[in-house]
C-alpha cells in the first residue's frame, strides 16, 4: 500500500500541494475532500469569480443593497476587522482599487488627482454589515479578500483532515504552510 497520497493544484490563483498519510487507504478520498473544500471557499470568496460573495458585494457598492452573508462570512469579516485594527489600518482589503495606479516597478501611472479620488474609495470601515448582510457604502469601492482567505482556507483544510483523524499531512498554498503530525 502507498504510504502517502499527494496532489498539486491551484486555488485562489496560487499553487497548492497537499500530502496526506495513506496508512488506512483513504488518502485519495481525503485529498478529494480537501480539493472540494478549497473549491468551495474559492467559489464563495474569490474576488475574481463573478458569483462569489466578494464579487457581489463589489458589484453592489454604493447602491445601499445588502448582500446576504452567512456565519462563515461574518466570521471572516470579524477576523479581518482584527487584522485591520492590529495593523492600525495599514492592512486594508479595500486597497485593490489602487493596484492599477502603479506600475509593477512602483511608478505612479495615475495622475495625483486620479489617485486622490481613488483614495476616497479606500477604507475597510466602509464595509457596512448587519446580522444578515453586507455592502460597501461608496460607488466604485471594492474589497479583495484573497490575501485573507488563503490562510483561512489552509486552516479549514487542516481542520477537515483532523476531523477525519489524519495523523500526518502537509498542506502548502504558495508561501503559506500547515502540517499535522
Regions found by a protein language model. Give the residues of each.
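Beta-rich nucleic-acid/ligand-interaction surfaces
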Residues: 175-181
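Conserved acidic catalytic centers in enzymes
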Residues: 88, 150, 174
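A conserved glycine-rich
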Residues: 147-157
